[in-house]
Structures are given as structure tokens and as C-alpha cells.
């Protein structure tokens, strides 16, 4: 079954196909689709910024549509990034600008690479707010940072050697290892004694705090309410 999180209709079709299949209940759901500023620009057919819809809104619809099919003690992981809190030398004044400005950015914001950082912040807001709203204390919902990985297709093959060198030289603490991060992600899904909920795991099975901005409950609620208004016709 195919799914494209940059299309709400595609997400709806996937959910319909899954419900009509014989797969049954879902134990684990990993929301890993994503593009960066290097590969994503413009609007989707739904009229939203392509990074916002691919990285956040499509997952928002997917998770909420599949919640009734989740095992009671299942696990959901939203793949975010430590770039939800960009380095100060990258942007010293990174503040929440409002969900609508991210979903339908003006000309200046539509060209900004900060759209990726904001989308990863949205992943964390979604994680925290989802836990508050579902009321299922057995369903474990967490966020994960795999680290910077130029060997993946996050940038659509458009990342340059110069950019890779820049990250390694200026942000070495943010570089990830594909094998190690993949294993950590698998462990977070399969570990039998795992009990953590609402945490952010950084390239391992050890959780760390997210940015101060990410704990703003007002922002998280605003994002949820607006996202719900955008996807309500696709359930």
C-alpha cells in the first residue's frame, strides 16, 4: 500500500485500504516521512506548504485516523529532529510564528530553511498534545531524533558536499549514524520493558529534554486545532 503524506487524499486512501485489508490491529506506528528545505518548496495540491504538510499535517491525519486500530498497549513514534531547536548561530531568534503562517507561509517564509525546523517542532507539539487528548495511558507515544544523515533522501539528493562539510565542522554534535539510529528506533518499538511516554529520544534509547519553546502548551493546542480544521473532511 502506498502513502504520500504531502497529500491528504493519499493518506485517506491509505487508511481506507488498510481498514479493508486483513492486517488487523496495529502495534507500532512510526511517522518517518520527511523532507528538508533543500528538497521542498512550494505548495501542495491541498494548498499547504509542502514541508508543513509532508512532515506534520499528513502524519497528523494518519495517526488520528489509525488510532482506533492501534493495540491498547501499542507504540507511536514521531520522528522529529534536534533541529526543532536550531543552533543560535543558525537563527538566534527562533520563535513560534503561528501555525497558519507555517501552513500557508508568505513569500519570505516560503523560501526559508527554517520551515524544516518549524516542522520538526510541530512533530514534538503533536506528540505532547496527542498524549493529553487520547486518554489511553497504555499507548506509548514518543518522539525520536535520528540526527543529521546526508546518506538518506531527506534532501531529495540536493544536499551538496559543501553543506555536508559545513554541518560536520560546525554542528558535529548533531550528526547521526544511520545504523545506530535505526537500531535505536527499532529498540524503542520492540523493548519489552519499555515504559516511557511523552519523551524525546536522541539517537539512542536515552531520552533528553526538548527545547523550552517545545513545552509551550498554548502553541501545541493552536497547532492541533488548526490542523484538525485542515483535515476534518478527510476522515
Residue ranges: model-predicted function:
Residues 1-153, 233-235:
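Rossmann-fold NAD(P)H-dependent dehydrogenase/reductase core
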Residues 143-149, 200-212:
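C-terminal/domain-terminus segments
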Residues 167-208, 217-219:
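C-terminal helical subdomain
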Residues 107-109, 148-150, 155-177:
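Alpha-helical membrane-targeting segments
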Residues 42-43, 105-106, 162-164, 203-207:
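Surface-exposed beta-strand-to-loop junctions
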Residues 185, 189, 223, 227, ...:
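Hydrophobic "lid"/C-terminal helical patch
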Residues 52-55, 115-120, 173-178, 216, ...:
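Aromatic-acidic/polar surface patches that form glycan- and anion
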